[in-house]
Amino acid sequence: MNPYILWLGSIFDQKMVMSSKAISPAANNWQLGLITPLCEKGLKTLVLERGRMVKHIEDYPTMNLDPWDVKYGGRTTQEELKNYNKQKRWGIHEGNRHFYNKDSEYDYDEIKPFDWIRGTQVGGRSLIWGRQTYRWSDDDFEANLRDGIAVDWPVRYKEIAPWYSYVEKFIGVSGEALNLPQLPDSEFLPPMELNCVEKELQSSIAKNYTDRVLTIGRVAHITEGTKNGSGRKACQYRNRCDRGCPYGAYFSSNPS
């Protein structure tokens, strides 16, 4: 009989239990990429989310509103922000605050500065993450050993690289391949285009330096084609990502 895979709590905050043994999962967007092959191989899989249901498109109430149609021009009042005294560090506004926990209801102790940005709902933080997606390099995996601090990583980049590729193909990552040892290339979709000022700066840096590079951010956005069977389509560059994307262009668990 196939074992059951049970995911407890919010998919971006909690732990996976398999055959009664707790396993710490990979963080953020990687988790669905790890669950998917288990499902595809026939394992009976149960995902439990803590919080309200958020259905793709149906529960993105501000996704198509123009700035002048959003209450208070999109700004959140100082009185309302008192409910988000920690979450507001990330970028709360009237177009997206329905995806964030109220600190007045879900507060946490903060002895030292610690930004715990949370969304208690189906999709969790996949609806509010910044989508910047980068591989660690040998420099990162070997840093502790090289600097003589903390604990050496038990794995190296070459061991993780195939799994980076697997997840990147699943979520869709756009970016520019540069063959930089300190920033390994991903399985890229076409990069987003720089604007004219950025292109001028990029050109100037290239002319004057051999050890510096300017490139577009590497983000979990589909920039070309679609993800078959997932309901996800290419980015429309609307700059309304944080309200929920009706095209599913950026990776979240909801359309996937």
Model-derived segments and spans:
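Acidic, Ser/Thr-rich peripheral helices and adjacent loops at domain boundaries
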Residues: 60-75
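Glycine-rich FAD pyrophosphate-binding loop
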Residues: 39-61
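Short coil-to-helix leader/linker segments, especially the first N-terminal amphipathic alpha-helix
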Residues: 1-9, 94-101
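Short, well-ordered alpha-helical packing segments
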Residues: 29-39, 51-52, 117, 161-168
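Short glycine-/acidic-enriched loop or helix-start segments at secondary-structure transitions
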Residues: 34, 57, 226
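N-terminal Rossmann-like FAD-binding beta1-loop-alpha1 element of flavoenzymes
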Residues: 3-12, 19-47
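Conserved redox-cofactor binding core of oxidoreductases
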Residues: 71-100, 105-115, 120-121, 129-135, ...
